[in-house]
Amino acid sequence: ISITALLSELSREGISRWRAKVGAEEANRISRQASSRGTRVHNIAESYIKNQEDHLEGVLPDAVEMFQSIIPLIDRIDNVHCVEGALYSDELKLAGRTDLIAEFDGALSAIDYKTSKRIKIWDHCHSYFMQGAFYAHAYEERTGIPVKDIVIIMAVENEEPLLFRETKDRWLEPL
């Protein structure tokens, strides 16, 4: 099972309540828009990390603006170990694809890019922390290289970006 499928299942009840509240058509529209925006910003960030000079070529202005807001955070990344790496944990029987394993402010971290239409608080990011904990654990399991930290870099529409930092051990237990 993928980490994404597992976490989706855990949050299914909340998503169902939200869909009932806003209606199926509106929920589908919002979901498509969020997914598309997230993919565009994620792709730019990946190209930027890989030092591809044309990382903004042909990209819509809203995605460029959101990406540019997170550049100061991305520039704190160094010593990249893995970009878009497929990972599997024999222990947890889970698989997934990490955005990035690299040093953030000098600490080897599982780094994930997120986008949001509005500012999120720490309490609304638990699934992100569990996802990051899985990536850190699976990377260590596969390579023998310890990854203790989780970093979530979140571009927020028309707002300053958010940075969440957690430790793997705190979020591995729920998995």
Predicted regions located by residue number:
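Metal-dependent nuclease catalytic cores that hydrolyze phosphodiester bonds in DNA/RNA
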Residues: 1-95
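Mg2+/Mn2+-dependent nuclease catalytic core
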Residues: 82-175
